[in-house]
Amino acid sequence: MAKSKGARIVITLECSDKAGEFAQKRKPGVFRYTTTKNRRNTPSRIELNKFCPNCNQHCIFKEIK
């Protein structure tokens, strides 16, 4: 019998700073973090305040697929 995957899943967090589009950036493009979350404890999408090296400032990172 195969084991179930469990409640932990890998998610991707993407920088959602729209003001950073027009500001000076270090590099072009969008920065992403990967992390895990417990599906049972946090069923909704996560939003975290993390540092974005592209925008060179702290931004809100939103969960994507």
Swiss-Prot record:
Pfam families, alphabetized: Ribosomal_L33
InterPro entries: Ribosomal_bL33, Ribosomal_bL33_CS, Ribosomal_bL33_sf, Ribosomal_zn-bd
Annotated GO biological process: translation
One MF term in the entry's GO annotations: structural constituent of ribosome
Localization, UniProt: Plastid, Chloroplast
PROSITE patterns: RIBOSOMAL_L33 (PS00582)
GO cellular component: chloroplast; ribonucleoprotein complex; ribosome
Keyword terms of this UniProt record: Chloroplast, Plastid, Ribonucleoprotein, Ribosomal protein
Family that this chain belongs to: Belongs to the bacterial ribosomal protein bL33 family.
UniProt-recorded name of the protein: Large ribosomal subunit protein bL33c
Organism encoding this protein: Pyropia yezoensis (Susabi-nori)
